[in-house]
Amino acid sequence: MAAPQLFRALVSAQWVAEALKAPRSSQPLKLLDASWYLPKLGRDARREFEERHIPGAAFFDIDRCSDHTSPYDHMLPNATHFADYAGSLGVSAATHVVIYDDSDQGLYSAPRVWWMFRAFGHHSVSLLDGGFRHWLNQNLPISSGKSHSEPAEFSAQLDPSFIKTHEDILENLDARRFQVVDARAAGRFQGTQPEPRDGIEPGHIPGSVNIPFTEFLTNEGLEKSPEEIKRLFKEKKVDLSKPLVATCGSGVTACHVVLGAFLCGKSDVPVYDGSWVEWYMRAQPEHIISEGRGKTQ
């Protein structure tokens, strides 16, 4: 295994399978299943993990590893909370973390956890290209049952440049210091299809650009090539040479925008963590752009 491979954003299923056969004590590999689904889908990610997962993987619960004092879903936890949680899963400073999920798309929620590790200073982290779907398609080994990780010491320090707040986005409406890319489906962005959360109407932040996260993926669920992703950004009139911020419904699929830019050589894209849910709940009606009901009060 060549060392540079360990720091790539994406690793292949075959690479992971080979790495599991030949573990390295100097840089242990830890697989994390970061599956997460919108509540209305009725899927239990942890139960599905216990039914089948990649051998040696642990389950990373995005909702558990979050700020439970926030009124918004799975906002980033503080550094101590993240360090304790990651350590409980067996992640140390020396660990190469590889993250995947079990979504039908290939990758859905895993890029959120990839972004979280980087935000807290752990850059030896990769995503399994194509996710568990691709692993299964390759007929690679699977396990079942609960995971049992040996706890490890892990320290974390949040890099604030990875996050944008509601105040940052509000100020940018006039200042226009950065572009905003929204990864939700087109109908939710336009205001013509419902949001999956009760009490939240669809629409978008003024001046934002829509690139649904699925547009970063091939039909097989693999990540598109950097050349294809650069072309996608260009088609959407997003300038990768200028500041860019990612948003979505609640900060999960926004991380596909971060990943796409990263693969194109732009590693400085932050996430608006509260995303559309926070924006809708806090914004004035004139700051909700929608072809639907919008916001009346």
UniProtKB/Swiss-Prot annotation:
Residue numbers of Phosphoserine PTMs: 35
Coiled coil regions, renumbered to chain: none
Keywords assigned by UniProt? Acetylation, Cytoplasm, Disulfide bond, Mitochondrion, Phosphoprotein, Redox-active center, Repeat, Synapse, Synaptosome, Transferase
Which residues are recorded as modified (N6-succinyllysine)?
Answer: 40, 146, 164
Where along this sequence does the record place binding of substrate? Answer: 188
Give its localization: Cytoplasm; Mitochondrion; Synapse, Synaptosome
Q: Which domain of life is it from?
A: Eukaryota
Q: Which residues carry this modification: N6-acetyllysine?
A: 40
Regulation of protein activity: By oxidative stress, and thioredoxin. Under oxidative stress conditions, the catalytic cysteine site is converted to a sulfenate which inhibits the MPST enzyme activity. Reduced thioredoxin cleaves an intersubunit disulfide bond to turn on the redox switch and reactivate the enzyme. Inhibited by different oxidants, hydrogen peroxide and tetrathionate.
List the PROSITE patterns hit by this protein, alphabetically.
Answer: RHODANESE_1 (PS00380), RHODANESE_2 (PS00683), RHODANESE_3 (PS50206)
Outcome when changing residue 197 to G: Reduces hydrogen sulfide production by 50%. No change in basal levels of bound persulfide
How the protein is affected by changing residue 248 to S? Loss of redox potential. Abolishes bound persulfide and hydrogen sulfide production
Q: Which reaction does it catalyse?
A: 2-oxo-3-sulfanylpropanoate + [thioredoxin]-dithiol = [thioredoxin]-disulfide + hydrogen sulfide + pyruvate + H(+)
Provide the tissue specificity.
Expressed in the brain and retina. In the retina, localized to the inner and outer plexiform layer, the inner and outer nuclear layer and the outer segments of photoreceptors. In the brain, localized to neurons of mitral cell layers, glomerular, and external plexiform layers in the olfactory bulb. Also found in Purkinje cell stomata and proximal dendrites. In the spinal cord, localized to large neurons. In the cerebral cortex, localized to pyramidial neurons in layers II/III and V, and in layers I-VI of neocortical areas. In the hippocampus, found in CA1 and CA3 pyramidal cells.
Question: What is the active site of this protein?
Answer: 248
Q: Which GO terms describe its biological process?
A: hydrogen sulfide biosynthetic process; kidney development; liver development; spinal cord development; transsulfuration
Q: Where is this region: Hinge?
A: 145-160
Report the GO terms under cellular component: cytoplasm; mitochondrial inner membrane; mitochondrion; neuron projection; synapse
Main EC class the enzyme belongs to: transferase
NCBIfam families the record matches: PRK11493.1 (NF008557)
Biological function: Transfer of a sulfur ion to cyanide or to other thiol compounds. Also has weak rhodanese activity. Detoxifies cyanide and is required for thiosulfate biosynthesis. Acts as an antioxidant. In combination with cysteine aminotransferase (CAT), contributes to the catabolism of cysteine and is an important producer of hydrogen sulfide in the brain, retina and vascular endothelial cells. Hydrogen sulfide H(2)S is an important synaptic modulator, signaling molecule, smooth muscle contractor and neuroprotectant. Its production by the 3MST/CAT pathway is regulated by calcium ions.
Q: Could you share any additional remarks the record makes about this protein?
A: Thioredoxin (Trx) or dihydrolipoic acid (DHLA) are required to release hydrogen sulfide from the persulfide intermediate.
Its protein name is 3-mercaptopyruvate sulfurtransferase
Organism lineage string = Eukaryota, Metazoa, Chordata, Craniata, Vertebrata
Q: Which gene encodes it?
A: Mpst
